[in-house]
Amino acid sequence: MDRHDFLWLSAVLLSGCGGRKYIRLPAGSIVLALGDSLTAGVGAPRHADYPSRLAEMTGLQVINGGVSGNTSGQALARLPALLRQNPKLVIISIGGNDFLQRQPESATRENIGKMIEMVQAASIPVVLVAVPRPTVGALLGMPSDHPLYGDLAKRYNVLLLKGVWAEILGDERLKSDAVHANAEGYRRFAEKMADFLRKQGII
C-alpha cells in the first residue's frame, strides 16, 4: 500500500469541533453512484442522467451504477462488483422500488445498512440520498423523504442528502412522470449534489 492509498484509507478524520472532515477528492477521482432508475436517468435523453451531469460539473469520474427497477436487495447484490472499480466515494440512492412494491421496511433498512457497511469496510466515504415515500402527500404533488434514511445516516454516521428528490418530484417542471425526473430535474439534482459535496469539503 503506497502513501496515497493510505491517506484514502484514512480519509474520514475527526475535526476539532467533533464533526467529520473529508479529504478533498482530486480531479478525475472515481465516484460510484449506486441506485435505480433515478440514477440510471429514466425520463431523460442519454447522458442527461445525474451522474453524467455531476461529472461535467465537478471533473470527477462518476460511474453510473443505476439500474431501472432495482430494489435495495438487487442493488446490494451488485455492489461488490462495482466496488472493484476502486471508487473514492459512493453515493447510494435506492429504495423507491421497495416502497412501490410494498416490500417490508425492515428488509429495505437491512439492505441499505449492509450496503453502507460494505462500503465503510473498504474505508470509502458514503453519501446516502433520501428517497420519498409513497404517501397521500406524494400523490398530491408534495412528496417527503422516508424517515428510514435519516435513521440510517445517524446509525452509521454517514452524510445524508435530504429533500432533493422530494423537491424535484414535487415540481411538474422537473419530472417526466410521477416517479422520474426529466433532464432538467436530473441537472438540478446534480447541481444540488455538487453543492453538497463542496460544503462538506469533498470537492
Q: Which residues fall in each region the model found?
A:
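N-terminal export signals
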Residues: 3-20
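Catalytic-site microenvironment of enzymes
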Residues: 4, 18, 28-30, 58, ...
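Serine-esterase "nucleophile elbow" of acetyl-processing enzymes
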Residues: 18-86
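Alpha-helical cap/lid subdomain in secreted, periplasmic
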Residues: 56-57, 76-203
